Structures are given as C-alpha cells and as structure tokens.
Amino acid sequence: MSVFVYLIRKYLSIPTPGGTASGRERLVDIIIRSSLPKLREKLLEALQAVLPIAAIVLILCFSIAPVSPSILLCFLLGAAMIIVGIMFFTLGAEMSMTPMGERVGSMLTRSQNLFLIIGVGFLLGFLITISEPDLQVLANQVPSIPNMTLILSVAAGVGIFLVMAFLRMLLGIPLPRLLVIFYAAIFLLAAFVPKEFLAVAFDSGGVTTGPMTVPFIMALGVGVSAIRSDRHAADDSFGLVALCSVGPILAVLILGIVFHASESSYLPPVIPEVGDSVELWQLFSEGLPTYLHEIATSLLPIVVMFGIFQLAALHIDRRTLGRIGVGLVYTYIGLVLFLTGANIGFMPAGNYLGQVLGGQSSRWLLIPIGMLIGYFIVRAEPAVYVLNKQVEEVTDGAISAGTMGAALSAGVSLSVGLAMVRVLTGISILWFLIPGYLFAISISFVVPKLYTAIAFDAGGVASGPMTATFLLPLAQGACIAVGGNIVTDAFGVVAMVAMTPLITVQLMGLVAQLKTRKARSAQPLLDPAALLAELPDDAIIEL
C-alpha cells in the first residue's frame, strides 16, 4: 500500500513533508478546494439515502427484533462510514470515472478500427471484472469449481459481452432482439444445471457489475454514442451494463454443467462481540487493510489502461488530468469506507435481524419489512447515483433523477418482498425469473428504446454491494430461522433485485409514452388562415 500511496502522491504532486509547493501542487490544491462545496452537497444526498435505513433498523431493534449492543454499535458505526463513503465516491466518480470512460469511448469510436475496438473492449471488460472484489466472494460460494477457473471464465464473459455491446451500438442493432437471444440461451442452459447453482448463477450477473465497473462502463457507452450524429445515438448510449450482466450468468451456468457441481457452501457472517469502544474500533480497523488492498487492486487496471490511452492518443490537458487524479483519490477513499462499513457493520446486523424476524410466530412480517427496507436501501447503492445523474443528463431532464430513483425503489421493494416469499415457502427461483424476464423482454418491443436500455442497465446497477451485504444476509438469516435451504432459497436475492427494475422502469416509459400521445391528441388543430389573419401586416411581409 505504501507504494500505491507514493504513486498517488507523485502523480498528484502532493508535497512531501519539508517540500515546497510547485505550480502543479497549487493546481491540485485549487481542485481540492473547489470540490469542497460539492462534497457538502454529496453529504446531504448520502444522509438522505442512509438515514431512512438506519431509522428502520433502529425501530426494529427497539421493538420486535432486539439485538445485542455489539451488533447495534457495529451497525451505527458502519452506517456512519457508509455515509462518508457515498459522499466521497459519488463526487469521485463524477470527477474521474465518468470523464475517463467517456474519453476512451470517444477515442475508440473515432479510430474506426474494428480490431482495436474488439481488442480493447475485451481487455477492458476482462481486467475490470477480474479485479472486482465481489467476484472473489462469488467464487467461494461455488466450491466444486476451482476459484481461478470461475474468475477467469466470468471475466472473459464480461469482456466478450462488452465487445458485443460496442458492436451493437456501432451497428445500430436493437437491444431487445439481442436480449431475446441471450436470455433464451440462459434459460435453456438453466434446464441442465443442478438446482443448487441456479440462484448463484443468476446472482453472478448482478454481483460482477459493482460500483467499480458500472460508472466506467456506462461512461464508455456515452462516449461511443457521442461521436454518432444519428437520432438514435442517445438511445444507444445505454445498454452496456445490460449485456455485460449476461456474460457472468452464462459463464457460471456452463461451468456448472461442465464440472457437474452438486452443491454450494454457505459461511454465515461472524456476529461481532465487543466489550467497549476500543474493541469496536479495533474490529473495524482490523478489516480496513483488506478493503484498502481490494479497492487498490480494483482501481489499478482502470488507471493503467487510461494511462496507456493518455500517452498514446488522448493527450488530455494538465488541469483535467489533475481533476481526474483528485477524483480517483476520492473514489478510492469512498469505496474503502463504504465497503468496510457495509461488510463489518451492516452484514452481521442483516443476518441477525433475519434470524430474529424469521424465528417469530408472525414470520410473515418479513415480507412487508423486507419491502420497506428494499424501497430505501437501493438509494444507498453507490452506482445508482451515477446512473440517475447520467440518465438525467442524456435525456436533457426528460427523465429526472427523482423519477428514476422512484422507479428503482419500487422495483427493489417488490423484489425483496418476493425474495422473502421464497425464503418462507421454498419456491424455485425460476418461477419468478422466467415470467419476470418474459414480461420485461415482451414489453421492450413496445416501450421507447431508450427506456428499455436504461431499464436493463438499472437491473445491474441496483443489485450492488448494499444488496449483497444487507439484503442477502437478511434473507440468509431468515432462512436459517425457518429451517430452509440457504443455497436454493436465500441465494437469488441479487437476481431478484436485478430483475424487477427491468419491469418498473419500462412501465414508467410506457406511461410516459401514453401521456405524450394523449397530450398530442388533445391539442386542437389550428387553421393556418386564421393564424395569418391574426398577424399584423409587417409580420406577414417579414414571413
């Protein structure tokens, strides 16, 4: 880590102790100072996202689901770290990941070199995915398949489908047509895979599109479409995450068939026990180095690839580079704090709450409580901020961030409710996924193309680390309490969360389309002769 810190210091020219400030150092100082007002704005957004979740959990803890002081204190400290982490990450992604992706995407399109686009696209998808921290967790859940085999296969799947996404945008291939083909292949393969691996396979699609990969991949799409001048360019600026989510699902399903895997394993999170405030801080500080290393490993491939592009083709000015460098530091700090708080503070609390609620006689309360938590928790997903902002910018405000957030919240709320039904009843996940995807793909042929692309991107974005570190442990804890099968009944929450936004966002688009048609039909037809009669003579002559 000391080497990584030294490289950042040298790249940003942050003065070492005893050093003197140069022009570049003053530039970095100006950039940092100019970002402080934005940090305050992001802090308010983070508070609005996390405080409702904290309030719901506190109400449960002080009423029907009592927890130990250790779990409660860990949860509260974790919530504070998540708030600060979201604040830094959202600003950092705006300053670094988004402009980096847009410039690389534009450069690839301008080159008009198909082999370069295919090669770089695959390499980007492969390297970004192989360093995704959540992929390591997924690999440990499938012990019958060697970890490195699974990781390399999933990364290759993302790389291949990122190339397909690029080619789709350049060739103008409709997204619904590709979705029909790929999801038909997925459900065909699912018929030959052991049921123990179905949920894990579908979860992999949401797990691998994490907060590190989503902002960069989405920005690549905007950069590629920005070079096109046709009227469908804005529609095709989304859809990269949608196709990248298909690759991991296919990879895990194929590996499940090849390796004849028969079962998966589940290791419940360790319930923390702390005696005082020093032990509480020690618990978090011991986990901090793990996430410092993980996020550094995740950021490094993106930084290296961008550095190569900068030297070879981009040649961005010094001020913009300084802003990107400061943004990368913010992104790094934000993700480290976020993942530390989520994994050490939220995960044990979610698991224990699930056990307490599932162990009560009125266990049906899991369904409405899960829906309430799901409605608010998606607002705390780091990548959701990036998606909502990008949607608002690309559509020139036609789809506001608030409208997009409401559609995502409704979708995730529904998905968590259905996931809790699965936990309580043991219904196969295919009974939900097949009708859900069939409906989502069917309406994609009548909904405006832009909404379809946004919807399928939103599915990968909504199923982020908050789902994996709180909603999934909540379902696992409840499954333990009711005596269910963890692997078949609890896993699959991520897949459910990734599916329902496809429906809610497209329905939002359908409603908007119907309103537009109704407004146009309600407008009275104007008589040209009457309009001319109302104009003064000078205006008619000018016309």
Predicted feature locations:
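Juxtamembrane and boundary regions of transmembrane helices in multi-pass small-molecule transporters
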Residues: M1-E25, A165-V180, E196, R228-E273, ...
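Hydrophobic core segments of alpha-helical transmembrane domains in multi-pass membrane transport
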Residues: M1-R9, A49-I64, G78-F88, V120-L127, ...
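Intrinsically disordered, low-complexity non-transmembrane regions of multi-pass membrane transporters
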Residues: S2-A46, V50, G101-F115, S229-S237, ...
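Interfacial loop-to-helix junctions that mark the boundaries of transmembrane helices
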Residues: R40-A46, V67-L77, T109, V142-I151, ...
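Alpha-helical transmembrane segments and their helix-start/interface "positive-inside/aromatic belt" motifs
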Residues: E41-A49, L73-A79, M107-F115, L175-V180, ...
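Transmembrane helix-loop junctions in multi-pass membrane proteins
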Residues: I59-L73, A93-E102, L127-V142, F161-I173, ...
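Transmembrane helical segments that form the transport core of multi-pass membrane transport proteins
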Residues: L72-L77, V270-A383
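Helix-loop-helix junctions within the multi-pass membrane cores of secondary transporters/permeases
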Residues: G105-M107, L114-A185, R363-S444
